[in-house]
Regions:
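Catalytic core of tubulin tyrosine ligase-like
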Residues: 269, 273-278, 286-290, 295-475
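An acidic- and aromatic-residue-enriched active-site/binding cleft used to recognize and process polar
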Residues: 137-141, 150, 158-159, 197-200, ...
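Residues at the starts of beta-strands that form the adenosine-phosphate
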Residues: 191-192, 220, 304, 416
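Conserved beta-loop-beta/alpha segment of the NTase-like Rossmann-fold superfamily
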Residues: 212-214, 218-317
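Intrinsically disordered, low-complexity regions enriched in glycine and serine
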Residues: 14-22
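Structural beta-sheet core signal
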Residues: 134-136, 194, 223, 279, ...
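N-terminal glycine-rich phosphate-binding loop and ensuing alpha1 helix
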Residues: 22, 27-219, 230-233, 239-258, ...
Length: 505
């Protein structure tokens, strides 16, 4: 199901395929009567969903109006296809899983300085020519962090107090400057597409507006919403959250593909001359947004898709890993919950590493042509993951299914995928759980940032003092000053910084 997409600077009137009826000429108020509208009753009955009107007689006129609008907003044919295809896919034997071929991975220890410099230069050139767009997955709330705000609004407690959104925006600003310097000071803005959800869209837009888009031009940022889908029972029937309202849930971060398609943003990218898309999740405090090295590697390899990966920290780590599905088949991500415990312990006798060691950390690069292919392919196949959850319903919380697609579902459609190994301590500081949890907290992410930046400062000839143990603190380098530790010698050499502090111009 696709709801009407609301896009900052871009609006759409059509949603997905199948002809959703939204904003019908006849208002729901004039339709509400003793019985539900005849055409609507017939539509829901055709798809076996007539239970949505089971409590009609108990509803007020206003509640009936709301229910009619809620049902009319659905593309019932599309949703029925999704439910049938997703249920049918359960229990279907999957291709045999094989490890990722070593030749598919660019490993840190095998890369030369010359290669890195060449990829960096290639990436900056493409950026300076306007060929890269950045795509941010930001539909989640910070509930697990103890906040009702969008996760990107969250501050992990750095000396600057900057939010995740601000850190990422300033990295874009820095790369724009570096790209312009590499191309005779010709400035081309990087367009930033930010996917929100119905639960975070308004707050996200207001946060950017109130902070002046963190120095970016407002017209280089586009917000768009992912869709939602009805939650369903074990027999595929819609669950009613209240007598007059469907229980719905976001369609997963993989909903980005259909959202880009239905909001016509793939066409928008093409008009802007974009050829490559850097895609990432909001909850990584060390994400290198618009990384020229990764982009240059991607262009050099000539593949349709690529992903940054880190090696599993230990066999039982709860992360999805890249695998090959079937002999000679495509690369795909296998969730840790899908792995047999014995698989997690298997060792590659040649390398001495785990056979299944390449963790997916949601740092991806795609060509625009491939994004178009994925958007059409996923829509055609209509297979969603079924997540069993407790769903709020008129009968209290009941077990049911949420229907989701994941960002990594794209890889099974890719004719060619390359994996690019990065170091956790340099590029992966996840912010998922509240402080006090055992891992992926704001505190752990903050320490990863401060330790990395402290190493940059020392490497540039600076000195650090501190009033608490250095392992618990450090210095923060503003992204406006340095992207990966460059440009710091003139600022740091011979100077002493008292941690914690932020280094700016």
């Amino acid at each position: 199901m696709k709801e009407l997409m609301v896009v900052s600077k871009v609006t759409t009137n059509g949603v997905g395929s199948g002809g959703i009826i939204i904003g019908a000429a006849t208002s729901a108020a004039s339709e509400a009567s003793v019985t539900p509208p005849q055409d609507l009753r017939e539509r829901v009955k055709d798809y076996g969903q007539d239970d949505v009107f089971a409590l009609w007689d108990e509803l007020s006129l206003e509640e009936r109006d709301f229910l009619i609008r809620d049902i009319r907003s659905l593309d019932l044919a599309r949703i029925d296809r999704i439910i049938r295809c997703s249920f049918r896919s359960q229990g279907v034997p999957t291709p045999e899983i094989e490890p990722v071929p070593e030749t598919s991975v660019s490993k840190v220890e095998e890369r030369t300085m010359d290669e890195r410099a060449r990829w960096w230069k290639m990436g900056l050139k493409a950026i300076s020519e306007g060929r890269l767009a950045v795509l941010l997955l930001s539909g989640g709330q910070g509930t697990r962090l103890g906040s009702s705000d969008p996760k990107g609004c969250f501050s992990i407690g750095l000396p600057s107090g900057k939010s995740l959104f601000q850190l990422q925006a300033e990295r874009i600003l820095r790369i724009q400057r570096l790209a312009a310097q590499s191309n005779d000071d010709t400035f081309v803005p990087i367009h930033w597409y930010i996917m929100t959800s119905p639960f975070t869209d308004d707050a996200t837009c207001k946060f950017f507006e109130s902070h002046g888009y963190f120095g970016l031009d407002a017209d280089q940022v586009t917000f768009f919403q992912q869709g939602t889908l009805p939650c369903v029972s074990k027999d595929g029937r819609f669950i009613m959250e209240t007598p007059n309202k469907l229980a719905r849930a976001p369609d997963g971060n993989g909903g980005v593909y259909s959202a880009l398609k239905s909001s016509k943003l793939l066409e928008d990218m093409a008009k802007r001359g974009v050829r490559y898309i850097d895609c990432y999740g909001v909850d990584n405090a060390l994400v290198r947004v618009a990384d020229p090295t990764f982009l240059g590697y991607f262009i050099d390899k000539g593949v349709a898709s690529a992903a940054k990966v880190v090696r599993k920290a230990y066999p039982q780590e709860k992360v999805g890993v890249f695998v090959r599905r079937g002999r000679g088949g495509p690369l795909a991500v296998l969730e840790y919950s899908e792995m047999d415990p014995s698989m997690t312990l298997e060792i590659n006798q040649t390398t001495g590493r785990l056979r299944y060691c390449w963790s997916n950390v949601c740092l991806h690069m795609f060509t625009l042509d491939f994004l178009n292919q994925v958007a059409h392919g996923l829509e055609k196949d209509s297979i969603y993951h079924l997540a069993e959850k407790k769903i709020p319903s008129v009968h209290g919380h009941t077990m049911g299914w949420k229907l989701e697609q994941f960002i990594f579902d794209a890889f099974t459609y890719s004719p060619s995928t390359a994996l690019f190994e990065v170091l956790r301590e340099e590029e992966f500081a996840p912010v998922k759980n509240a402080n006090g949890s055992t891992y992926d907290t704001p505190d752990s992410a903050r320490l990863l940032v401060l330790r990395l930046h402290s190493r940059w400062v020392v490497a540039a000839g600076g000195f650090l003092t501190h009033s608490v143990p250095l392992y618990a603190t450090g210095v923060e380098v503003s992204p406006l000053v340095s992207y990966t530790g460059e440009n710091l010698e003139a600022i740091c050499r011979g100077r002493t910084f008292h941690a914690p502090c932020e280094i700016t111009y």
